[in-house]
Regions:
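Short, mixed-charge aromatic SLiMs
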Residues: 54-57, 149, 205-210
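Residue-level signal for threonine
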Residues: 106, 175, 203-205
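A conserved helix-loop-strand patch within extracytoplasmic ligand-binding domains
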Residues: 1-65, 73-82, 89, 107, ...
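A generic structural-conservation signal
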Residues: 22, 44-45, 70, 88, ...
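Secondary-structure end/capping motifs
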Residues: 111-192
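Conserved C-terminal helix/tail region of periplasmic/extracytoplasmic solute-binding proteins
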Residues: 180-212
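Pocket-lining segment of extracytoplasmic ligand-binding domains
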Residues: 53-146
Length: 212
């Protein structure tokens, strides 16, 4: 938003202009899902600009376009740092547990290389264990070399925000509830024509072993 809104509600978006990123992009789809969940019609109750690539929306907002913008980190915190915008809500919090990142492999590869898949999953689980057992400050210092363009204070702010929002699961088990939520969002946006059975697409065998 362009100003601090401690009492923000999704109804505040009615009649406003919002930079949503490209149609079919995950942020835009999650955003529209939340709007509909709150009784807001994305096509009629507000104006969502889908003409700007998601990587350019922060610059457009900073340049004066729209009343609100949907942003990833570190763009959201960067807008706050330059007093160009304020974070007033989180799509992740209001959407429910959306499985935003997933790893896939062919069934033939899974069957032929279970040890490789298990080692890969175990390594990811170590990362999950680390964020569960360390402070945002400690996490920020470890990941800082991967974000050379962002200063440590900003990284710490971002990690703290993710921490408070319960962004990171304690394990890698892809549960059916989250899978169905993802399909709901895709279906709601018109990007999914036919639902896929959870059992046909997801295996939790490796994640369950890694969690123990």
């Amino acid at each position: 938003a362009r100003e601090e809104m401690p009492d923000f509600s999704w109804d505040d978006l009615k009649g406003k202009d919002v930079l949503g990123g490209r149609k079919g992009g995950m942020p835009e789809m999650v955003f529209e899902y939340i709007l509909k969940k709150n009784g807001i019609n994305p096509q009629k109750d507000l104006s969502i600009n889908q003409s700007i690539d998601f990587g350019s929306t922060a610059a457009a907002f900073s340049g004066g376009q729209a009343d609100y913008t949907i942003e990833f980190e570190p763009s959201a915190t960067a807008l706050e740092a330059e007093n160009s915008g304020y974070v007033v809500a989180s799509l992740g919090v209001d959407s429910g547990y959306v499985p935003y990142t997933a790893y896939s492999a062919k069934t033939s590869y899974l069957n032929a290389n279970p040890n490789i898949i298990q080692k890969f999953t175990n390594a990811l689980q170590k990362g999950m264990d680390f964020v569960q057992s360390h402070t945002p400050e400690e996490i920020a210092k470890v990941i800082a070399p991967q974000f050379k363009e962002t200063d440590l204070a900003t990284i710490t702010t971002i990690v703290s925000r993710y921490y408070e929002q319960d962004t990171w699961k304690s394990d890698l088990i892809f549960n059916e509830e989250s899978f169905n939520l993802l399909q709901d969002i895709l279906e709601n946006s018109g990007e999914l024509k036919e639902r896929v059975p959870y059992e046909e697409l997801v295996t939790t065998t490796f994640a369950k072993k890694a969690a123990h």
